[in-house]
Amino acid sequence: MAAGALRGLPVAGGGESSESEDDGWEIGYLDRTSQKLKGLLPIEEKKEKFKKAMTIGDVSLVQELLDSGISVDSTFQYGWTPLMYAASVANAELVRVLLDRGANASFEKDKQSILITACSAHGSEELILKCVELLLSRNADPNVACRRLMTPIMYAARDGHTQVVALLVAHGAEVNTQDENGYTALTWAARQGHKNIVLKLLELGANKMLQTKDGKMPSEIAKRNKHHEIFNLLSFTLNPLEGKLQQLTKEDTICKILTTDSDREKDHIFSSYTAFGDLEVFLHGLGLEHMTDLLKERDITLRHLLTMREDEFTKNGITSKDQQKILAALKELQVEEIQFGELSEETKLEISGDEFLNFLLKLNKQCGHLITAVQNVITELPVNSQKITLEWASPRNFTSVCEELVNNVEDLSEEVCKLKDLIQKLQNERENDPTHIQLREEVSTWNSRILKRTAIAVCGFGFLLFICKLTFQRK
């Protein structure tokens, strides 16, 4: 076999190359005619054969050379050990053999651990997962960081390896650790556009509010890299299941993460009913209560539902009619941001009236949705505490949240009233200005009507929350 035929294979030392014949991983002609190596070859020749056997992945020859006296932790050029090289190419069989022969799974070279090397390897996720699992079984530290303060979970999240991320967390990896730039595993997944990783990390307790050194949250990183689906996902309200896996034991978490689809149908760790979660309220408000069981069986959260594509809807058994309702509701939820801070002073004074009116209309519609949601919850609440069959938290928790809601609604009502007074003041000044050309009466009437509706909706929402608060206090 010619030497040039195999030069495309990875080399140790992070892919650095060398034209020197003394390269630690140089691949030359491997003589297979003499494999009875017990003391017949000089030690240097054995080492050379060992390097070449490692490079081409010849497991049987590696074992034979180890039997002949080659050290399993011998270091080659760039200071890499055989185990580090095997991990870098995701050769799970070689990793297993070397570990069984006593190779050090915690070896580091220039702050580069073998576990980090495995998580950033070029190979299929299946092989990388096997290598990581083997290393973790030999007590490799899942939180060891490289020179850039990146941990194994960050590399796995960056490269899109969902199962590897989950396995690392199951063995104690910290989800919210930040690297030298302030990136977390969630930030890396958002940057690279790995939606499944983002969902898994949120489920495992990732904090989506942590900022990078330049003050960017994961959602902003996703938006900057044009991953709009992930941006919407991270911008949406909290997921009822967010962080639930953190409460499980290591064994339960591994079972949850690595089970097959058939196992999930038999063993629902999250099958217990969460009363009036975001998903239930959302579906109830759209008249889609019949979808609740279907979505729960498939472990689909509200966050996931609202970021689905059309093919995902169909794949999960959601009819086209129901799809249209969900998409219409999602469109209504997307209130466009008006970036006043990015506008010049002249532009601020001439901000589009249509945009401002559209903002008020959407705000009013949002208030209407909130009122409907609270009405539905009040309707579904049991009349007395004896009818509550499932375990609830202390009612004090509910009433305290209701009190905060009432306060927030009162604050919102106050701000809307200020806005209304300001607009009324501007309107009066314009009417009294002799140089002003009077607009059609219908426009001012319509604007006033919208503001009145918004104020009424806010006050009505506050009244409903007050009733809800009294209901909880009575119980």
Curated annotation (Swiss-Prot):
SUPFAM superfamilies: Ankyrin repeat, Pseudo ankyrin repeat-like, SAM/Pointed domain. InterPro entries: Ankyrin_rpt, Ankyrin_rpt-contain_sf, Asz1_SAM, SAM, SAM/pointed_sf. Keywords: ANK repeat, Cytoplasm, Developmental protein, Differentiation, Meiosis, Phosphoprotein, Repeat, RNA-mediated gene silencing, Spermatogenesis. Residues 272-334 form the SAM domain. The modification Phosphoserine is found at residues 17-18, 20. It is found in: Cytoplasm. One of its GO terms (biological process) is male meiotic nuclear division. GO terms for cellular component: pi-body. Its main location: cytoplasm. Coiled coil: none annotated. Gene3D superfamilies: Ankyrin repeat-containing domain, Transcription Factor, Ets-1. Residues 1-25 are annotated as: Disordered. It holds the Pfam family Ank. ANK repeats lie at residues 45-74, 78-107, 110-144, 148-177, 181-210, 214-243. SMART domains: ANK (SM00248). Plays a central role during spermatogenesis by repressing transposable elements and preventing their mobilization, which is essential for the germline integrity. Acts via the piRNA metabolic process, which mediates the repression of transposable elements during meiosis by forming complexes composed of piRNAs and Piwi proteins and governs the methylation and subsequent repression of transposons. Its association with pi-bodies suggests a participation in the primary piRNAs metabolic process. Interacts with DDX4, PIWIL1, RANBP9 and TDRD1. This is Ankyrin repeat, SAM and basic leucine zipper domain-containing protein 1. It comes from Nomascus leucogenys (Northern white-cheeked gibbon). The lineage of its organism: Eukaryota, Metazoa, Chordata, Craniata, Vertebrata.
